[in-house]
Amino acid sequence: MRYLLPAVAAATALSIGLAPAAAQTKSGHGHHQRSRAHVSLHLSTHTVLVGRGLAVRGKVRPSGRHRVKLVFRGPDRAVRGVTTKANGTFALRWVPGRTGSYAVRAYGVHDRRVTGSLSAARKLTTYRLAGASYYGPGLYGNGVACGGTLLPDTMGVANKTLPCGTMVKLRYHGRSVTVPVIDRGPYVAGRDYDLTEAVKQKLGFPGVGTVMASR
């Protein structure tokens, strides 16, 4: 028979060490497989005052020049783009404009060499400086503006404008506490918060001074 059936021809070719034409065509395509990128992210601090910058650093593996998108999500949203160095590292400085809690992530942008990926979220709290005092002695047993009774172990703060129940994170010399707004005040110029005795003790606050506040 002059012509072999396709299946027979393929079997014959394999028996003498040749690859079928279809197999040769498929293997001849030089498809480039993308590798999976890995992005690491580090913040120089996890607490910063509004208006002051922090360093944001990271690395993309495999090394090379890659595009990275940094996203800051919190009271507002900020996006910054950066190109890595040849060794895959990147760095920039970011200055927050509002107080509150942020989650920061780095996204490795998908390109012809790597598939996109994202880093673990890094937490950041931004603060402002706030004048503070404390109250309690002589007032225990009295009601507070947001409901309840002021006692020596009451954890909370008084503020003139924040809604009752608003959670505020305060820092003083490395100590921190998160407490609700429970009362109104202080009605003294230059002061934003009145701390209860229990909050004062928790922070090691002297009585009158400046604290870092997340609101």
PLM segments and residue spans:
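Secreted/periplasmic proteins
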Residues: 2-12, 16-51, 55-59, 64, ...
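Short, ordered, surface-exposed loop/turn motifs in non-cytosolic proteins
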Residues: 63-73
